Design a protein with these regions (language model features):
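Charge-lined substrate channels and their catalytic hotspots, especially those that engage the 3′ end
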Residues: 1-336, 343-388, 425-428, 738, ...
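Short, acidic/hydrophobic/Gly-rich beta-strand patch recurrent on exposed beta strands
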Residues: 84-88, 105, 160-165, 761-766, ...
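Acidic, glycine/serine/threonine-rich low-complexity segments
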Residues: 208, 695-696
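Short Cys/His-rich micro-motifs in 6-15 aa windows
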Residues: 829-831
Length: 840
């Protein structure tokens, strides 16, 4: 495979640091498949921002474009027609990076033919003192939406589709004859959405007919003679211009927007979630044998005689992990974590592997899932079903009574799970339920040992400063028609805790082992928060009388051109924005604050705000530690059925095990994990001779996967994870809005979760539904927004609406198109939240 570094070095040598496709083919001496490989690789590098597409089949280094004041970034549109471009840091010169710290405003007439989400090339015209800028779009580099889902309408000049995503601001014209799809894609029930019957034949679709998944059933093809008001998916055939709307053709008819199941179909297409398995991948899955050869069993470590169990939710169908705990003769605990050996069946470069990499992760909706692997594997051959022999990768850890790791073994193994347990069932046993303890009598002692060890491991994490936000999550119940029946608070019991602690331990153990061997792998990293976010949180926390304890933050003040222009000639002082510099912050600071606010009225809001101040965790080929877990090394090893990075870690580990003289790694190869100091502590890290040091970026490492490919997989997987999370969140919000439509006029207790210049957001206490109280609806006084304290204050009455305040609101109106809820305030005299400005 052609290395990316070769391409980058070759382009860097060119006079303008740019080269054409044919030039690269000629000068690199590529032929046949190598040409196709180069084309595919160039497209991937453009998608990641490593290269810029600067003309017809011509590519340049981002720095070359930056020299001409051109940078690449992702366009976010506003429904009023203007947009913002978030710059790609790779395309910024050091000088521009120092000045440009915000996004780039694009006026409507400077959007050109770009659409929301496109990767675009921007010409910067002005950088403001606050780090934001203005510019114009030169051209799109890569399109984000080859297809668009929307509502079909008939107009005076023919059909058009109004996109459901309001950020796609232009309607898509549908020429005559392009309204009905002639051929259906492989049905979305092709072993792709859990709960549906497999159907694998490609069929010619009758005019206006459609197949879609309805929960556990497959809809019959429906006849549509009139498309008015129906949801359709459209392929863009002609991109927009400054004077012309985009054009397209209908590829799928999904049904009416309010039909059961259509909201999921809309979400799948809006977020471009891969949901059709290629025929080659399905064929590989069907040909995979569940029979384990005797030679394979003999070479693996045999755990079949132990009472190993899986513990999952009631509706789970893919069982990644199984666990077992026992006491050793020396009084220590032995924790066994067995993970489905997916890498045994999904081999590198296979059709299954390519599709799994494309998907990156399984996506879970309330009534179904879009799995990463076909159901033959995800719910059968790879799933650790009870009383069935299954291949696993095993992490067996010996731990003392402080939870410290004494020794461990990693091996390829085989298990036979004795019971498929649920969190509810295990919790009942541990809570002393007589019926549950009788039913699972042979396992009661094991579950009690698991509980004891989990509590020890939790205390160990607390000692090192690990942050634990125990935030409630909503649980949605549906009726037989698939409509929301209720929303309730999720219950997190001891069974959830023990599985969480065991998986964390296994992930950390594997990460440290691979790092100590200097083997290239993927890590799950969580970097320390930005100074600006810490500063913003400290300002808000101070109004409640709390602090993270970071001390006085060094800041510098800037003025924006807009503020200077507004103040000119008025005699008013120009407003200054405070921008913090670097700040020393540790996980323990967050942990101590969570302990202080535990059980207090302000706990919920401050916990949310602390969480928002942190960065998102992501995947990386470079180990940068995990801030929230206060872990020096961490990876994802425990869910290879539903996460592609875990599958990669399995491949790396299996290669390590098979290279060794035996099938397990002994502790002698790795010093005590705790010897390595936290990267956020003030203590010095031990020298390399005494610890497993993190390799420098792009160091030559061993292992089956090169650093460049690992980097590529890490970025792809991080994007896929964010895409899945966004899709799951949006669908959930849509269902909440639909649930509240019949409750307009009803009043509820709520909590103010965010205060802005245009109003404040309230989350209903019992329903986890959020809505906005617009500032202009507070008509009893003239209210102003105070940015420093995040408060809205009445100028005459001095009424205050502030973060964390309990409030009674009425459901005023619902916007089903934008999926937004508007509340109206009921209480006459808002009261500050308890604990406000309390000194600690």
């Amino acid at each position: 495979m052609l290395p990316e570094s070769t391409i980058l070095k070759h382009i860097a040598k060119q006079p303008k640091r740019a080269a054409g496709f044919k030039q690269l083919v000629r000068e690199l001496g590529l032929r046949g498949d190598e040409r196709r490989e180069l084309d595919s690789l160039l497209q991937k590098m453009v998608a990641r921002g490593t290269l810029l597409s600067v003309g017809s089949d011509r590519y340049a280094l981002p720095a070359a474009a930056a020299d001409k004041n051109l940078i690449a970034g992702r366009l976010t549109m506003h429904r009023d027609g203007f947009g913002f471009v978030i710059p790609d840091s790779k395309s910024l010169t050091p000088a521009l990076k120092a000045k440009l710290t915000g996004d780039i405003f694009i006026a409507p007439h400077l959007i050109g033919n770009a659409m929301h989400g496109d990767l675009v090339l921007v010409d910067i015209s002005n950088v403001r003192p606050d780090g934001r800028a203005e510019g114009r779009i030169v051209r799109p580099v890569m399109r984000a939406h080859p297809t668009v889902v929307g509502i079909f309408h008939y107009g005076s000049r023919g059909g058009y589709v109004r996109p459901i995503d309001s950020k796609i601001t232009q309607e898509i014209l549908i020429p005559a004859g392009m309204e009905f799809p002639s051929v259906s894609p492989v049905s979305s029930v092709v072993n792709e959405v859990e709960g549906a019957e497999p159907q694998r034949t490609r069929r010619t679709q009758r005019k206006g007919s459609v197949d879609r998944v309805l929960g556990d059933e497959v809809a019959r093809p429906a006849e549509w003679d009139d498309l008015e008001g129906l949801v359709v998916d459209v392929e863009i055939t002609d991109w927009p211009s400054p004077t012309q709307n985009p054009r397209g053709r209908v590829t799928e008819i999904l049904g009416r927007e309010d039909d059961f199941g259509v909201d999921v179909e809309i979400t799948i297409r809006k977020f471009h979630l891969p949901h059709h398995f290629p025929a080659a991948a399905l064929e590989e899955a069907q040909e995979t044998s569940a029979v384990i050869p005797s030679a394979e069993l003999e070479r693996r470590r045999d755990f079949r005689g132990l009472p190993i169990v899986t513990i999952d939710g009631e509706t789970a169908r893919d069982f990644d992990d199984a666990v077992y705990v026992r006491m050793l003769e020396n009084g220590n605990f032995e924790l066994q974590v067995h993970i489905a050996d997916v890498a045994q069946y999904v081999t590198p470069g296979s059709a299954l592997d390519q599709e799994a990499r494309l998907r990156g992760t399984s996506v879970y909706f309330p009534d179904r899932a879009v799995p990463m692997l076909p159901l033959e594997l995800s719910t059968d051959i790879c799933s650790l079903r009870p009383q069935v022999e299954r291949l696993v990768l095993s992490c067996v850890m010996e731990m003392d009574h402080r939870g410290e790791l004494v020794s461990y073994e990693l091996s390829e193994g085989v298990i036979r799970s004795v019971e498929r347990m649920t969190y509810t069932g295990v919790n009942a046993v541990l809570e002393g339920d007589a019926a549950a303890r009788s039913r699972y009598a042979p396992l009661v002692a094991t579950f009690e040992l698991m509980r004891d060890l989990a509590l020890i491991l939790n205390r160990k994490r607390e000692r090192r400063g690990s942050i634990d936000f125990d935030l409630p999550e909503p649980v949605i119940e549906f009726d037989e028609l698939g409509l929301m029946k209720s929303i309730s608070r999720s219950e997190r019991n001891i069974a959830h805790r023990l599985i969480e602690e065991f998986m964390l331990s296994a992930n950390e153990c594997v990460a440290h082992d691979l790092e100590s061997r200097h083997v290239g792998s993927l890590y799950r990293i969580h970097e320390k928060p930005d100074a600006k976010r810490v500063y913003d949180f400290e300002v808000i926390a101070a109004t409640f009388g709390y602090s993270l304890g970071v001390g006085a933050l060094p800041i510098h003040r800037v003025q924006t051109k807009t503020d200077r222009r507004a103040a000119y000639g008025t005699g008013k002082r120009v407003r200054e924005i405070e921008v913090p510099k670097e700040v020393h912050i540790t996980p323990r600071m967050y942990q101590k604050l969570t302990e202080k606010i535990a059980g207090k009225p302000e706990e919920r809001i401050l916990s949310y705000l602390m969480l928002r101040s942190l960065k998102q965790a992501r995947y990386s080929e470079e180990n940068l530690g995990h801030f929230a877990l206060a872990a020096t090394s961490y990876t994802h090893f425990t869910s290879p059925i539903r996460r592609y990075p875990d599958l990669i870690v399995h491949r790396v580990l299996k290669d390590v095990l098979r290279q060794g003289s035996s099938q397990h790694v002994s502790q002698s190869l790795h010093p005590r994990i705790e010897e390595k100091a936290s990267p956020w502590s003030k203590r010095r890290v031990l020298p390399d001779s005494a610890r497993a040091g993190a390799p420098a970026p792009h160091t030559a490492l061993g292992g089956p996967i090169g650093v460049e490919e690992l980097h590529e997989i890490a970025e792809e997987s991080s994007r896929a994870e964010r895409r899945a999370a966004d899709a799951e969140r949006e669908l959930m919000e849509g269902k909440k809005v639909k649930f509240m439509q019949d409750r307009v006029g009803e009043d509820f207790d709520g909590l103010i979760t965010s205060v802005t210049k245009f109003g404040f957001f309230v989350e209903l206490t019992d329903l986890f539904v959020e809505g906005l109280v617009p500032l202009n609806t507070l008509t009893d006084d003239r209210y102003t927004y105070h940015e420093n304290t995040r408060e809205i204050i009445g100028q005459r009455s001095r009424k205050i609406y502030s973060l964390g305040q309990k409030i009674r609101v009425l459901v005023d109106r619902i916007d089903p198109v934008e999926k937004k809820i508007q509340f109206a305030v009921l209480e006459e005299e808002p009261v500050r939240a308890k604990g406000k400005r309390k000194k600690h």
